[in-house]
Amino acid sequence: MGSKTLPAPVPIHPSLQLTNYSFLQAFNGLPVPAEHMPNLYGFSALHAVHLHQWTLGYPTLHLPRSSFSKVPGVSSLVDSRFQIPTFPLFPHMIHPKQESPNLSNKTKPRFDFANLALAATQEDHCKLGQMDDQGSPPTIGGLLDVTKLTPEKKPTRGRLPSKTKKEFVCKFCGRHFTKSYNLLIHERTHTDERPYTCDICHKAFRRQDHLRDHRYIHSKEKPFKCQECGKGFCQSRTLAVHKTLHTQVKELKPSKIKC
């Protein structure tokens, strides 16, 4: 029995007729000028992008469009029943960029290092202005440059700027303090105010912790003890003065031995 060959099914989407490999392979048999070969590779790459957009459901890019009929030999590869879809293309892929003679004659101004930041910002604006004057559609690089954050809108990282510390000034002597409590205690030296009074001997103090240390005098408890000699004290500052005596004695002993 002879095998019957079935006709090839008609593709659902016209762009599925062409693949990167088959498209370029078909062009090997056609007389295509050498200058149009990069355009064919660009068409193949953009065809793959269009295929992914169609299959995945992504919206198409709203960019300047041009037909592939300008590329020689494209219309002969596609069946006449299907219409060649238009893909987003950039003009430089089909037509080479032509430099205007006016721009080539202009000389670039000398860079001024004194105004570095100003010159950098002006250079970007000049580039955008030149593109608008030429009338050429914006490229992807130009669109990305426009969407970049300006230095003013960049999010700040790291610590916030430190707040200025408040200064509390004594109205009697003009001394500065960083805390209001320290200023309050200092001003009591000028006014001789002693709001904390002992209940036993009625001695008054400027600070509450001084009154607390004073109360140990009336009791037998001496919580502050010297580690050198074991002597106890009622106040911490009295113990600190006592420790200086031990350090002075240690400094005098080596000097006596040398003599």
UniProtKB/Swiss-Prot annotation:
Keywords: Developmental protein, Metal-binding, Nucleus, Repeat, Repressor, Transcription, Transcription regulation, Zinc, Zinc-finger
Segments traversing the membrane: none
GO BP, sorted A to Z: angioblast cell differentiation; intermediate mesoderm development; mesendoderm development; negative regulation of DNA-templated transcription; negative regulation of transcription by RNA polymerase II; pectoral fin development; podocyte development; pronephric distal tubule development
Gene responsible for this protein: osr1
Cell compartment(s), UniProt: Nucleus
Name by which UniProt lists this protein: Protein odd-skipped-related 1
Cited PANTHER family: ODD-SKIPPED - RELATED, PROTEIN ODD-SKIPPED-RELATED 1
Traits of the deletion mutant: Embryos show a down-regulation of early pronephric markers lhx1/lim1 and pax8, and disruption of pronephric development.
Sections of the chain in a coiled coil: none
Zn finger intervals (C2H2-type): 168-190, 196-218, 224-246
InterPro entries: C2H2-ZF_Transcription_Reg, Znf_C2H2_sf, Znf_C2H2_type
Family: Belongs to the Odd C2H2-type zinc-finger protein family.
Keyword Lipid metabolism applies: no
Source species, domain of life: Eukaryota
Primary role: Transcriptional repressor. Required for pronephric kidney development.
Keyword Transport: no
Main subcellular location: nucleus
Assigned GO CC terms: nucleus
The organism of origin for this protein: Xenopus tropicalis
GO terms of molecular function: zinc ion binding
Gene3D superfamilies found in the cross-reference section: Classic Zinc Finger
